[in-house]
Amino acid sequence: MTEETSQSPVIAIVGPTASGKSTLGIEVALQLNGEIINCDSVQVYQEIQVATAKVPLEERNGIPHHLIDFVPPSINYTAVEWAREAAKKIEEIESRGRVPLLVGGTGFYLRALRNPFFISPQTDESLRLRLNTMREQRGAEYLHRVLRRLDRRAAAQLYPRDWPRVQRAIEVYLQTGRSIVDQKDERPEAHESSRRLRILALNPPRAELYERINQRTEDHFEAGLVAEVQYLLSRGVPPNSNALGAHGYRRVVEYLEGKRDLPGAIEQTKLDVRHYAKRQLTWFRHEAGVEWFDGFGEEKNVLAAVLTALAGGPPSK
């Protein structure tokens, strides 16, 4: 028996933003003697709090949380870096006789962990949006100059006006630290992940999810989101950083730059987050072996269904 087949799959609790993943993760951890590894690309950053839905310390019920609040907001943290750290944390948690639980909605992170030698050409949402804005404001040739500074080999193979491939090459390099030239012949099936994942996904009613997103967005602005962005900018965090490219933060930056009014920033943020939730659901529906649970993570029947599945259900293939 190989090491991989002898080990239990690592549990991942995923779903769209505002679906109650964090609450469900804590409840499952309490039942399984678990510790949580954050799998959200925004919650890794220090100093950004208001719009990140990080669970406050006093609400974690004593459950240790890892890979949260540990990256300076001026640093563009990649999926590859997260996957390496997550793999280490999984081993550390298991060495203590406890159960690691991956909790979050960043599918790209999970894919990087599942396939440590392959990163899909898809990228995280904030990076793609920033590159789109860069191209719209400065043109495709500027984007090609950016690629040339990052990855001369890829730039030499692409025409400046072929912006979709230029942008893809930038995304791959920033996410993996490797040239797309080195990755273009790789396929996910060519590599085996060192650990299997058992992915449990929340599927709340769409209309209720969107209502929750709209209300949470308004709550974030009322809780001081604009002041938080002003503070981060005053600390020298670049406005085009991954941290400030996150949903909510990006539109506030535009508001502070005079590109839109505050009501417009709020409404656009609601739309952005609703679209993002839809894309998250689409992403996980395309992942193999995902087990779906209808409802929000705070619902007792959802917790009961998840615990029942974990007690006797088969792992994802």
Please report, for each region that a protein language model flagged, where it lies by residue.
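Phosphate/pyrophosphate-binding catalytic cores of soluble transferases and nucleic-acid-acting enzymes
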Residues: M1-K317
